[in-house]
């Protein structure tokens, strides 16, 4: 005879004294359709083996098992076994949402949008009806984007070991419908043809949901500009025609009344009026809305310098049933200026602290304009009161006093803020309830409110957050903290109480990885800040999510505990990942306009088209490693390089290694074609997000070609000889810029030192050092001052080296030389350096041909004043560049601004100029015009002897990105 007691979330019926009750339980079993085991539920099962079978205990066990959220249904079976009874809990396991994937997503939609539309959050229970709802949600999104014929099939894969279910939504999108026509219903006030022209929708278009919203927004703006402030537009219906795969849009338009808004007594543009008046945003015409508009206009005119401006509202005129007129009357008063403010009576809070929250400000030549209005002042007074309350002065009062005749000048306003601080409220007793002695000992020192210190409501809220964070980071995800304060029995003394309800501590039973098809499990687990058998730490979950995103291997990462809404203490943590495409192909093209290579020493103004290709493969071998190939081709250079990047080497998060190999041939120096073959290895140590040190070894073979008629014939055999360079170098970089592409604040510093040595495989021994420092200062919201300084030197060392060169007649000659190979010398000039020269035209030149031959020292200092307009879309730059390339560090004379002769190039060139910028998604598009104040003179040997020439004073540059 079997006795069954069932639990489906309600009380089980009592059974009247069957023969099994009271008999000893010899064994307890658990049978489910998932891999759940009895030891996991020791706390929930109160009926124990060896005890008499008790109906109340069995019923309580069923209740507790069901409360874990692990079961859809449960029952208890009791069967005789010898002299006792076997108690079996039989249940149907509940499954939880795991990885949700969508395949077949049509363009222009993306899979992440459709996954979000399913509304199936990771780790939550999956109910029977939710799958159908999720499928319908995806269909709705597809229909909203004109995929009416799309079909969506859902499939699930249950994992009994983890109780998670993987959901796959397969889309067959069909063809996107085209627009057949647009009809308008309602009181539109304009013809359908006029409104259709406004939307930008045309027959034959494939309209997505964003494009429809954009068209509706255009109609709304169309009405707004014509005074229909209460107009409403929405899609009433979308009619699909299956035979032609087209759709009709039915748009409902209600124009509403025409509302004229006039401002009398002062001028203001219609555009500005639409921007600042509330009724243009919400369309509400009532007294509170009109009064808000009055205050906004008062603030506007006072900031314009009319410090006593007042704005009143005239009664609303109803011209017709559908036509109203609203008039604001402005009394500007005399124009004035705001001279400044001061604090009086602040004995405990410094002027500097108080001034840090003020928004009103006097004008300061040359960059800062004045800002003042009574509204700004009221907001500042509230901010000052907040500062005082945070310092314990709960009753502080601040009264402004206005002096409109400051320094005996009429309409020159000075404000004195008279502060009555009052008594400071102190903290009496601190009562931390609901915690253990160990927890109290850990928490009390970290609280902002401390006994004997000043009391602050702000600190009370901070303490609540501190306590809550302490518990949630230790597995108490359901913790609650109630903060309260009460008078301590004497004046200006507050007792503070924190009532804590921690709930049950949750621990991580296991970590389940989902979606890492190609990425190795170890790569993922190394980034996790939590492990099994640790308390569930919400901060660790968020930190792990951030670290996985930082790998660059995943498009989306979600981390959540399974079954989060129950009081179950042993949690599975799910890590769901959507892997990014492993292969990426990028290509581009462009044109560079500068003085490029020619037979003339100064070059000719030419356009250089260029194309580039980049192919990268992430996750090589399932690891966090990247292989990249890059190729480029232009009239200036051509080349290719391959790199292999290994971050976190070997498992250190602060060390990375990069292997590089490249081959290129470039003509960016007029004098020669530089051919280079190079291999290098770079190891980088990152100290922080802004600072890192790198060490690199590079081995390259360089050669200068096409030297005929560009340098003296006697120098060609040595200069054209191929040279091997083996160099070890260290670099230090400190980057505090707010935006590396277009910085407005911060600084950037780099220092690099290298040695080329025969012991490293080099045929030329020389030392090289370079340094750069750039700083950026925002002077006003629309003006940035930027400075960049570069210094570089190189010097040969050691004994003269024996070099075998081949003469033009084929004979070989041994030469003793210290010369640094031509492609290894410094060159300067161009859009991102010294804009008084074209690309790489600065510095020493050959005394016979006049072509640049580079130098062993370089200095550049650039100053820029950057202005922005049109909401930062346009910009103007005024710049001054100074510097040059020098033959050696000993001949670097920064204060020498002239040449002694046409063969003396060791002087400093100054260049002034202006640049124009247009912001694009890839960076600022920049056109610069540079003017050399003291351009270089050089000599050229001609048929009639030496001829002295001068480089052009004016240079033109077109490029993308800021110069530094």
Please give the residue ranges for each predicted region:
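Residues that define the transmembrane beta-barrel architecture of outer-membrane proteins
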Residues: 134, 215, 293, 380, ...
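C-terminal outer-membrane beta-barrel translocator/porin domains of Gram-negative envelope proteins
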Residues: 550, 572-573, 584, 590-604, ...
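Repeated loop/turn-to-beta-strand initiation elements of outer-membrane beta-barrel proteins
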Residues: 555, 583-585, 619-627, 649-657, ...
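Residue-level signature of outer-membrane beta-barrel architecture
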Residues: 617-619, 646-648, 663, 685, ...
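Transmembrane beta-barrel wall of Gram-negative outer-membrane proteins
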Residues: 636-722, 730
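Outer-membrane beta-barrel architecture
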Residues: 574-576, 614-616, 628, 643-645, ...
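Transmembrane beta-strand segments that form the barrel wall of outer-membrane beta-barrel proteins
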Residues: 528, 560-561, 585-603, 613-634, ...
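Periplasmic polypeptide-binding modules associated with outer-membrane biogenesis and secretion
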Residues: 15-597, 610, 614, 628-646, ...
């Amino acid at each position: 005879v079997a006795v069954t007691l069932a639990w489906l979330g309600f009380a089980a019926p009592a059974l009247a004294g069957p023969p099994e009750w009271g008999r000893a339980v010899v064994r307890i079993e658990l049978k489910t359709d998932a891999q759940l085991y009895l030891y996991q539920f020791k706390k929930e099962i109160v009926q124990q083996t060896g005890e008499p079978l008790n109906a109340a205990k069995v019923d309580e066990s069923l209740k507790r098992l069901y409360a874990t959220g692990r079961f859809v249904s449960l029952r208890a079976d009791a069967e005789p076994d010898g002299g006792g009874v076997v108690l079996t809990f039989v249940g149907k396991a509940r499954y939880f949402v795991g990885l949700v994937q969508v395949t077949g997503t049509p363009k222009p939609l993306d899979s992440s949008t459709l996954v979000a539309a399913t509304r199936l959050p990771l780790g939550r229970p999956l109910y029977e009806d939710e799958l159908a709802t999720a499928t319908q949600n995806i269909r709705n999104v597809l229909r909203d984007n004109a995929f009416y014929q799309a079909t969506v099939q859902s499939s699930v894969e249950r994992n009994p070991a983890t109780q998670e279910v993987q959901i796959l939504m397969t889309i067959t999108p069909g063809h996107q419908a085209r627009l057949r026509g647009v009809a308008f219903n309602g009181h539109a006030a304009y013809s359908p043809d006029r409104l259709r022209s406004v939307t930008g929708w045309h027959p034959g278009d494939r309209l997505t949901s964003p494009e429809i919203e954009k068209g509706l927004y255009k109609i709304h703006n169309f009405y707004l500009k014509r005074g229909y402030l209460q107009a409403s537009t929405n899609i009433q219906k979308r009619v699909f025609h299956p035979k032609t795969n087209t759709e009709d849009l039915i748009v409902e338009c209600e124009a509403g009344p025409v509302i004229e808004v006039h401002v009398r007594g002062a001028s203001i543009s219609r555009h500005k009026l639409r921007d600042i008046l509330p009724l243009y945003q919400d369309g509400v015409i009532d007294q509170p809305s009109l009064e808000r508009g009055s205050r906004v206009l008062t603030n506007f005119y006072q900031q314009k310098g009319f410090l006593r401006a007042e704005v009143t509202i005239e009664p609303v005129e109803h011209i017709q049933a559908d036509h109203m007129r609203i008039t604001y009357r402005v009394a500007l008063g005399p124009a004035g200026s705001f001279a400044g403010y001061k604090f009086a009576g602040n004995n405990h809070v410094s002027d500097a602290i108080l001034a840090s929250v003020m928004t009103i400000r006097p004008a300061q030549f040359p960059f800062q304009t004045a800002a003042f209005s009574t509204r700004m002042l009221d907001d500042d007074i509230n901010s000052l009161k907040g500062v005082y309350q945070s310092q314990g002065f709960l009753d502080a009062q601040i009264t402004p006093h206005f002096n409109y005749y400051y320094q005996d000048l009429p309409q020159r306003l000075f404000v004195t803020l008279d502060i009555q601080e009052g008594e400071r409220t102190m903290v009496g007793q601190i009562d931390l309830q609901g915690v253990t002695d160990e927890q109290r000992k850990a928490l009390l020192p970290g609280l902002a409110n401390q006994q004997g210190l000043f009391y602050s409501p702000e600190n009370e809220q901070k303490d609540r957050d501190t306590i809550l964070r302490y518990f949630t980071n230790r597995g108490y995800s359901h913790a609650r903290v109630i903060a309260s304060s009460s008078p301590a029995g004497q004046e200006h003394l507050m007792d503070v109480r924190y009532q804590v309800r921690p709930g049950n501590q949750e621990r991580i039973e296991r970590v389940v990885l989902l979606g890492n098809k190609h990425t190795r499990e170890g790569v993922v687990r190394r980034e996790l800040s939590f492990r099994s058998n640790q308390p569930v730490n919400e901060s660790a979950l968020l930190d792990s999510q951030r670290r996985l995103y930082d790998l660059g291997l995943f498009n989306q990462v979600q981390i959540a505990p399974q079954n989060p809404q129950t009081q179950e203490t042993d949690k599975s943590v799910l890590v769901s990942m959507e892997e990014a495409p492993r292969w990426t192909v990028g290509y581009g093209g462009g044109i560079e306009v500068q003085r490029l290579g020619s037979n003339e020493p100064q070059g000719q103004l030419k356009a250089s088209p260029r194309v580039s290709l980049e192919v990268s493969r992430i996750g090589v071998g399932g690891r966090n490693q990247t292989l990249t190939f890059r190729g480029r081709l232009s009239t200036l250079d051509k080349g290719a390089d391959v790199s292999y990047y290994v971050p976190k080497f070997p498992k250190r998060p602060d060390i990375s290694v990069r292997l590089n190999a490249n081959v290129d041939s470039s003509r960016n120096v007029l004098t020669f074609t530089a051919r280079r073959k190079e291999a290098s290895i770079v190891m980088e140590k990152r100290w922080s997000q802004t600072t890192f040190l790198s060490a690199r070894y590079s081995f390259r073979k360089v050669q200068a070609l096409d030297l005929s008629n560009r340098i003296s014939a006697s120098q060609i055999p040595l200069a054209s000889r191929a040279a091997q360079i083996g160099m070890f170098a260290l670099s230090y970089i400190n980057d505090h810029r707010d935006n590396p592409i277009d910085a407005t604040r911060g600084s950037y510093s780099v220092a690099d030192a290298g040695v080329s040595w025969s012991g490293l495989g080099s045929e030329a021994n020389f030392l090289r050092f370079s340094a750069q420092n750039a700083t950026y200062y925002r002077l006003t919201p629309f003006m940035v001052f930027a400075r960049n300084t570069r210094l570089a030197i190189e010097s040969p060392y050691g004994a003269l080296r024996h070099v075998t060169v081949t003469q033009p007649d084929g004979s070989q000659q041994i030469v003793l030389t210290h010369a640094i190979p031509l492609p290894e010398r410094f060159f300067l000039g161009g859009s991102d350096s010294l804009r008084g020269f074209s690309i790489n035209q600065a510095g020493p030149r050959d005394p016979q041909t006049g072509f640049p031959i580079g130098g062993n020292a370089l200095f550049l200092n650039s100053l820029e004043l950057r202005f922005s307009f049109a909401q930062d879309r346009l910009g103007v730059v005024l710049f001054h560049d100074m510097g040059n390339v020098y033959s050696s560090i000993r001949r670097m004379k920064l204060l020498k601004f002239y040449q002694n002769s046409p063969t003396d190039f060791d002087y400093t060139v100054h260049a002034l100029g202006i640049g124009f910028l247009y912001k694009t998604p890839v960076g600022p598009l920049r056109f610069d015009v540079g003017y050399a104040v003291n351009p270089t003179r050089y000599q050229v040997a001609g048929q009639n002897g030496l001829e002295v020439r001068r480089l052009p004073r004016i240079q033109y540059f077109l490029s993308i990105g800021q110069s530094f």
